[in-house]
Swiss-Prot record:
Keyword annotations: Cell cycle, Cell division, Septation
Job description of the protein: Could be involved in septation.
Recorded name of the encoding gene: spoVG1
Record-stated family: Belongs to the SpoVG family.
Protein name: Putative septation protein SpoVG 1
Domain of life: Bacteria
NCBIfam families named in the record: PRK13259.1
GO process terms (BP): division septum assembly; sporulation resulting in formation of a cellular spore
Keyword set includes Cell division: yes
Species lineage: Bacteria, Bacillati, Bacillota, Bacilli, Bacillales
């Protein structure tokens, strides 16, 4: 199984949720509403879930082994970190690379 695409949208809230993501598996299957949560021990990925009538949350889709969970978490958190980097201003980068020779 390969994660072939990760789409991530940051959310600005006062809560612990930092982003919502969708992943594509093997270019054939998409899972939406994967959340990036800021937990007590750092960022982690929460799979999509729904609330049952008794108030409990149940995963809609989830990996069945730790290796697959690790792949999903690594891919989503890598996309989150890239989204956190400031954009590079191409004009200032070009100006800095010009060296005057006298």
């Amino acid at each position: 199984m390969e994660i072939t695409d990760v789409r991530l949208r940051r959310v600005e809230t006062d809560g612990r949720m930092k982003a919502i993501s969708s992943i594509t598996i093997d270019g054939e299957f998409v899972i939406h509403d994967i959340r990036v949560i800021d937990g007590n021990e750092g960022l982690f990925v929460a799979m999509p879930s729904k609330r049952t009538p008794d108030g409990e949350f149940r995963d809609i889709a989830h990996p069945i082994n730790s290796g697959t969970r690790a792949k999903i978490q690594e891919a989503v958190l890598a996309a989150y970190e890239v989204a956190d980097e400031p954009a590079v201003n191409e004009e200032s980068s070009a100006d800095e690379s010009i060296v005057e020779e006298n």
